[in-house]
Curated annotation (Swiss-Prot):
This is Ribosome rescue factor SmrB. GO terms for biological process: rescue of stalled ribosome. Gene3D superfamilies: 3.30.1370.110. InterPro entries: Smr_dom, Smr_dom_sf, SmrB-like. The gene is smrB.
């Protein structure tokens, strides 16, 4: 083997002797997440039915009372307000993402319904919905739709790393 460091044999021997008792360190600083379990294939008919069922909850006529002061936020009655604070601080990291850019209101409602159904099916507690800025149609409607769904515990404007004012972090109620 050619010596690429231009060391003499004595220097190499000295180095090997100095590290003779060294042991490889075990990596303990990064927590590795296990990949999500891939379940059974879900029939397309069931997925479509879940979308239709979930979009049933979204009405354009009903206007829930949302606080207009400050960032967009909501907490379902009976849910601890500390959950909204944890969303605001970024304590929850979303495991599912939905980008509504370029969708019509009807498509956006269906996709929101599908996202909530997928969160329940996959046992995902926090999701990120990116509505964008655009003409503010979806930005205004998305919180109103989410506040109507019975499986949404809370939502808050996302921290900058998850989209800032163009996104919402949503907490979904999971069955125990």
């Amino acid at each position: 083997m050619k010596n690429k460091y231009h060391l003499t044999t004595d220097e190499l021997q000295l180095f090997k002797e100095s590290i003779a008792g060294a042991k490889k360190l075990k990596q303990d600083t990064i927590v590795h997440r296990s990949p999500p379990k891939l379940g059974k294939k879900i029939a397309p008919e069931r997925l479509l039915q879940e979308q239709v069922d979930a979009s049933y909850y979204f009405s354009d006529e009903f206007q829930p009372q949302l606080d207009t002061e400050g960032p967009t936020r909501y907490v379902r009655p009976g849910v601890d307000h500390f959950e909204v604070k944890k969303l605001r601080r970024g304590d929850y990291s979303p495991d599912m993402f939905l980008d509504l850019h370029g969708l019509t209101q009807k498509q956006a409602k269906q996709e929101l319904g599908a996202l909530i159904a997928a969160c329940k099916r996959e046992h995902v507690h926090c999701a990120c919905v990116m509505h964008g800025h655009g003409k503010h149609v979806l930005k205004q409607q998305t919180p109103l739709w989410l506040a109507q769904h019975p499986d949404v515990l809370a939502f808050h404007q996302a921290p900058k790393e998850w989209g800032g004012t163009a996104a919402l972090l949503v907490l979904v109620e999971l069955e125990q």
